[in-house]
């Protein structure tokens, strides 16, 4: 049990608390002592230093990836920020990680992980498609000095080289919701660190570090924030990787803005409730859509036959709130479908309160190589918090209209 006035010492030992409690109280240490109930938003871009010597020492300490020492000056917002640190502490606890490092966007987080691998002399990456289109594009261009081998899950071990720095997977995968067996991937990777994009599941449904992953990445813009009003990325990992990531962040200036940190940290407090509500709706929607003649196949982990390896229960605690579907009429049918939706919003992104629909091959996965791009008939749906009947009515009406227009 948590004592009534224990927020001074909260986070000292929270390992015995349930995830729902961690989401509410994580990163809240010291609030009672400060006389406040919620964290303050510190917008300072610079911080006073006591003298030249200690200021210089603090600067060097933080710029090389260390965390702020008690009593030291943070010197400059690019090096360390208190609200960002609170968000990091909260997310690390949820992912069973030693630490977490937050960034301005999810792509900034991915960039930092790749740069850390390059700087360590291990620029080769093994990646399993599909991935988020931005991640795929970044790897394919080699812009950061990386080289990539695209491998099937079963071929990871044979793809690893002496200079392989990371194995990168996303599960469920964006946009098709393919499932990856993390135990199998970690075993195949051997001593090579595995980075898992956990954006679709969130720590509510999946904790990759518990399966041996070294780094867990989130586009915090999505479910963690949950309201479509703050951008950010975050990686939960061990202390060694966290130090390397903070150094890259300090050098590249990719720190999450304090206002974004506040909103994303606040979003964590309702994450479990939002995620489970959206998941319930998604499961029912997937079944209704699966029966529609305009759809050739619905991809949703919770549907019968779509989890042949039994990852639900063993790796994931639920099917999540994302749905992918393939329209029998291909691109023309897909385009007509999304353009006939009224309640459901035609937009990229995901994980917010409202339901979003988009055509990945035209938008989020447009830069992906033709051989790996999603099919022209595939649609991605991020299920929100609306009533399931209202969503079903809108989607089925749009499907019917697209068939009539064919």
From Swiss-Prot:
Family of the protein in this entry: Belongs to the trans-sulfuration enzymes family. L-methionine gamma-lyase subfamily.
User: Which reactions is this enzyme annotated as catalysing?
Assistant: L-methionine + H2O = methanethiol + 2-oxobutanoate + NH4(+); L-homocysteine + H2O = 2-oxobutanoate + hydrogen sulfide + NH4(+) + H(+)
Query: What Gene3D superfamilies does the database record attribute to this sequence?
Result: Aspartate Aminotransferase, domain 1 (3.90.1150.10), Type I PLP-dependent aspartate aminotransferase-like (Major domain) (3.40.640.10)
Species per Swiss-Prot/TrEMBL record: Brevibacterium aurantiacum
Q: What is its EC number?
A: 4.4.1.11, 4.4.1.2
Q: Share the entry's pH-dependence remark.
A: Optimum pH is 7.5. Is stable at pHs ranging from 6.0 to 8.0 for 24 hours.
Molecular function terms, GO-annotated: cystathionine gamma-lyase activity; methionine gamma-lyase activity; pyridoxal phosphate binding
Q: How does it assemble?
A: Homotetramer.
InterPro entries assigned to the protein according to its UniProt record, in alphabetical order: Cys/Met-Metab_PyrdxlP-dep_enz, PyrdxlP-dep_Trfase, PyrdxlP-dep_Trfase_major, PyrdxlP-dep_Trfase_small
Positions that bind L-homocysteine: 132, 380
Q: Keywords of this protein's UniProt record, alphabetized?
A: Lyase, Pyridoxal phosphate
Q: Give the matching PANTHER family.
A: CYSTATHIONINE GAMMA-LYASE-RELATED, TRANS-SULFURATION ENZYME FAMILY MEMBER
Q: Where does L-methionine bind?
A: 380
Q: What cofactors does this protein use?
A: pyridoxal 5'-phosphate
Give residue numbers for the modification (N6-(pyridoxal phosphate)lysine): 222
Task: Report the SUPFAM superfamilies cross-referenced here.
Answer: PLP-dependent transferases
Applications (biotechnology): The recombinant MGL protein cloned from B.aurantiacum eliminates L-methionine in cell culture, and exerts strong cytotoxicity in human cancer cell lines in vitro. The cytotoxic effect of this protein seems to be attributable, in part, to changes in methylation-sensitive epigenetic abnormalities involved in oncogenesis, including DNA methylation.
Thermal activity profile:
Optimum temperature is 25 degrees Celsius. Is active between 5 and 50 degrees Celsius.
> What is the purpose of this protein?
Catalyzes the alpha,gamma-elimination of L-methionine to produce methanethiol, 2-oxobutanoate and ammonia. May be responsible for the production of methanethiol associated with desirable Cheddar-type sulfur notes during cheese ripening. Is also able to catalyze the alpha,gamma-elimination of L-homocysteine and DL-selenomethionine, but has no activity toward L-cysteine, L-cystathionine, S-adenosyl-L-homocysteine and D-methionine.
Activity regulation behaviour: Is inhibited in vitro by carbonyl reagents, completely inactivated by DL-propargylglycine, and unaffected by metal-chelating agents.
> What is the protein named?
L-methionine gamma-lyase
Q: Which residues bind pyridoxal 5'-phosphate?
A: 76-78, 106-107, 219-221
């Amino acid at each position: 049990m948590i004592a009534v006035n224990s927020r001074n010492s909260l986070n000292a030992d929270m390992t015995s608390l349930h995830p729902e409690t961690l989401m509410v109280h994580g990163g809240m240490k010291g609030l009672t002592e400060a006389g406040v109930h919620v964290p303050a938003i510190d917008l300072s871009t610079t911080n006073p230093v006591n003298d030249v010597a200690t200021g210089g020492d603090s600067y060097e300490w933080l710029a090389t990836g260390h965390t702020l020492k008690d009593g030291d000056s943070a010197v400059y917002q690019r090096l360390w920020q208190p609200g960002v640190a609170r968000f990091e502490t909260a997310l690390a606890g949820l992912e069973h990680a030693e630490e977490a490092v937050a960034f301005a966007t999810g792509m900034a987080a991915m960039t930092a992980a790749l740069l850390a691998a390059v700087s360590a002399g291990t620029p080769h990456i093994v990646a399993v498609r599909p991935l988020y289109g931005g991640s795929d594009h970044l790897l394919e261009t080699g812009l950061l000095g990386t080289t990539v081998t695209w491998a099937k899950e079963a071929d990871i071990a044979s793809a690893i080289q002496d200079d392989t720095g990371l194995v990168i997977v996303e599960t469920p995968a964006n946009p098709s919701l393919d499932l990856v067996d993390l135990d199998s991937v970690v075993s195949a990777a051997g001593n090579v660190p595995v980075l898992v994009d956990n954006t679709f599941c969130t720590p509510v449904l999946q904790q990759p570090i518990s399966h041996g992953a070294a780094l867990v990445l989130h586009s915090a813009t999505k479910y963690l924030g949950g309201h479509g009003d703050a951008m950010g990325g975050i990686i939960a990992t061990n202390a060694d990787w966290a130090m390397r990531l903070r150094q890259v962040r300090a050098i590249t200036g990719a720190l999450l803005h304090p206002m974004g940190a506040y909103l994303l940290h606040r979003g964590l407090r309702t994450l479990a409730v939002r995620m489970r509500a959206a998941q319930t709706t998604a499961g029912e929607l997937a079944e209704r859509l699966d029966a529609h003649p305009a759809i050739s196949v619905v991809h949703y982990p919770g549907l019968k036959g779509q989890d042949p390896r039994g990852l639900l229960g063993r790796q994931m605690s639920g099917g999540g709130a994302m749905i992918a579907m393939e329209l029998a009429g291909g691109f023309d049918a897909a385009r007509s479908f999304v353009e006939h939706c009224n309640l459901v919003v035609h937009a990229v992104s995901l994980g917010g309160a409202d339901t979003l629909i988009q055509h990945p091959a035209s938008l989020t996965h447009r830069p992906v190589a033709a051989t790996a791009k999603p099919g022209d008939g595939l649609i991605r749906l991020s299920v929100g918090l609306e009533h399931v009947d209202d969503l079903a009515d809108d989607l089925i009406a749009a499907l019917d209209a697209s068939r009539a227009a064919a």
